[in-house]
Curated annotation (Swiss-Prot):
Domain notes per entry: The Q motif is unique to and characteristic of the DEAD box family of RNA helicases and controls ATP binding and hydrolysis.
Chief place where the protein resides: nucleus
Gene: HAS1
Subcellular location: Nucleus, Nucleolus
Chain segments annotated as coiled-coil in the UniProt record: none
Sequence motif Q motif, residues: 66-94
EC number, as in UniProt: 3.6.4.13
Name by which UniProt lists this protein: ATP-dependent RNA helicase HAS1
Known role: ATP-dependent RNA helicase involved in 40S ribosomal subunit biogenesis. Required for the processing and cleavage of 35S pre-rRNA at sites A0, A1, and A2, leading to mature 18S rRNA.
Native source species: Cryptococcus neoformans var. neoformans serotype D (strain JEC21 / ATCC MYA-565) (Filobasidiella neoformans)
Family according to the record: Belongs to the DEAD box helicase family. DDX18/HAS1 subfamily.
Chain residue ranges for the region called Disordered: 1-59, 513-544
PANTHER family named in the record: RNA HELICASE
Alphabetically ordered keywords of this record: ATP-binding, Helicase, Hydrolase, Nucleotide-binding, Nucleus, Ribosome biogenesis, RNA-binding, rRNA processing
Length: 544
């Protein structure tokens, strides 16, 4: 194979929908778990997840949809909702919007894909409209989001919702032109969507930024904001913002001690607590079919390659544990004619934005990403979620699979596990996540190992990228908090090396820092590890 530089990761191939993908076929379940074989010749049984969960009520039987027309919203907002194609409210919207319109503070808990973006945007827009905010009044609503992509998405919905209103709106986020943002703030932006770091920067340093008239603060994905290291920034932001006559809304998929602490300092005493999931028997969407596959390290890439080749006409998201691993696999797959897009925290903001919207608008395609895409993003018609590298926590699993089966639609997910990682299933069971075991017939897995090793040995650019990906995979693995399940010392490095295309695994240095390393490995907007890393040197070793 050629040793020329691999092409830039793009996805220009036009695709159409195909009903035949690599779907699980029915097998007789074992006593301890439900197993199905992944075979493209037979479709998945519609009730496969029910074998684990037992009988379930159909979506919508527990909650009767309420029309938006019952809210008595302003004509511009009503018209915008109609243009967006919405007629009735989701459960979180029906339970949240009325008290917010009445001026109450709300602490909301809802699974991803529940419609909470509209739940806080509609009251925010109505508040600005009722108070007749103008640019000279400065900022009346601030919405804080953990990631740039989610901020852009919220901004896009706000733009549609405010189309018939006179109020101004804008987005502040790291990676964007700070001076251009500051110029707009001085002119007056009534509704702001922002990431924490950039918002704090403007609050502290932008002269002429008027926020003394702030009437509403929205903190979205609060648990994620805190997880990626913005706890101190959030405390500073809340101290700087006026609290008198300010309505606050805090939304979090999980209720942790830190989220409770943040709610205490940001919300007024006695907020209304709304949890639409507490009576649900599963933590994930009703229409989501979930499975896992057990395979050794040296089989992982070949299994992924086989799956993606058979699902080129589907919309698929594949999650990895590190930026370098995403980069390597994207370069490799594009080089061998499996077109993919890639999204991770080391990319420049313009590249991330372009990739994000290209995948959203594509009828089919494959997106390789880190957890930068796991929270809150509403990507239409995703067929499969593949967790090639398992998450460190059931909450992360839930947010990853939340990219599919949204708003009552169906979807599928597949989790890759090593035999040594099966203990993670116990944690998922406690978190009310129903899973089937899937099995790939070995004869249908493409044996491309020799070709892969030949390519990596001859192509300098791919070899360097593979080495970086291999090192980062070990680095991420060593930072997992569930050490008894994800133990880097139990990895067979010879087999791990083969998955990255090495006949003999390279010698690499990895740094294992403080507990923050787990969250900084995605390098989205969180700061680098500020602990003193200890070195671990991994030589060529493998279990016999």
């Amino acid at each position: 194979m050629s040793s020329t530089k691999p092409p830039t990761t793009t996805n220009k191939r036009k695709r159409t929908s195909n009903a035949h993908d690599e779907a699980p076929a029915k097998r007789v379940p074992e006593a301890s778990s439900s197993k199905v074989t992944l075979d493209d010749s037979q479709p998945a049984p519609a009730t496969s997840s029910d074998a684990v969960l037992g009988a379930r009520s159909a979506p919508g039987t527990d909650y009767e949809r309420v029309p938006f027309s019952t809210l008595n919203l302003s004509p511009p907002t009503t018209a915008a909702i109609e243009r967006m194609g919405f007629e009735t409210m989701t459960e979180v919207q029906a339970r949240t919007i009325p008290p917010l319109l009445a001026g109450k503070d709300v602490l909301g808990a809802a699974r991803t894909g529940s419609g909470k973006t509209m739940a806080f945007l509609i009251p925010s827009v109505e508040l600005l409209s009722t108070l007749r905010f103008k640019p000279v009044n400065g900022t009346g609503v601030i919405i804080i989001s953990p990631t740039r992509e989610l901020a852009l998405q919220i901004f896009g919905v706000a733009k549609e919702l405010m189309q018939g209103h006179s109020q101004t709106f804008g987005v502040l986020m790291g990676g964007a032109n700070r001076k251009a943002e500051a110029d707009k703030l001085v002119k007056g932006v009534n509704l702001i969507v922002a990431t924490p770091g950039r918002l704090l920067d403007h609050l502290q340093n932008t002269k002429g930024f008027v926020f003394k008239n702030l009437k509403a603060l929205v903190i979205d994905e609060a648990d994620r904001i805190l997880e990626i290291g913005f706890e101190e920034e959030m405390k500073q932001i809340i101290k700087l913002l006026p609290s008198e006559n300010r309505q606050s809304m805090l939304f979090s998929a999980t209720q942790t001690t830190k989220v409770t602490d943040l709610a205490r300092i940001s919300l007024r005493p006695g907020p209304l607590y709304i949890n639409v999931d507490e009576t649900k028997e599963a933590s994930t969407a009703d229409m989501l079919e979930q499975g896992y596959v057990v395979c050794e390290s040296d089989q992982r890439f070949m299994l992924l390659f086989t799956f993606l080749k058979k699902n080129l006409k589907k919309k698929v998201i594949v999650f990895f544990s590190s930026c370098n691993s995403v980069k390597y696999h994207a370069e490799l797959l594009n080089y061998i004619d499996v077109p993919v897009l890639d999204l991770h925290g080391k990319q420049k903001q313009q590249k991330r934005t372009n990739t994000f919207f290209e995948f959203i608008n594509a009828p089919a395609g494959i997106l390789l990403c880190t957890d930068v895409a796991a929270r809150g993003l509403d990507i239409p018609k995703v067929d499969w979620i593949i967790q090639f590298d398992p998450p460190d926590d059931p909450r992360d699993y839930i947010h990853r699979v939340g990219r599919t089966a949204r708003a009552g639609k169906s979807g599928k997910s597949l989790l890759f596990l090593l035999p040594s990682e099966l203990g993670f299933l116990r944690f998922l069971k406690v978190a009310k996540v129903p899973l089937n075991e899937y099995q790939f017939p070995q004869k249908k897995v493409a044996d491309v190992q020799k070709q892969l090793e030949s390519l990596i040995s001859k192509n300098h650019y791919l070899n360097t990228s593979a080495r970086d990906g291999y090192r980062s995979y070990l680095q991420a693995y060593a930072s997992y908090s569930l050490k008894k399940i994800f133990d880097v010392n139990k990895l067979d490095l010879a087999k791990v090396g083969k998955a990255f295309g090495f006949a003999v695994p390279p010698k690499v240095n990895i740094s294992v820092g403080s507990v923050k390393a787990k969250k900084s490995r995605d390098e989205d907007e969180s700061s680098d590890d500020d602990g003193q890393p200890k070195k671990a040197y991994y030589r060529n070793r493998g279990r016999k």
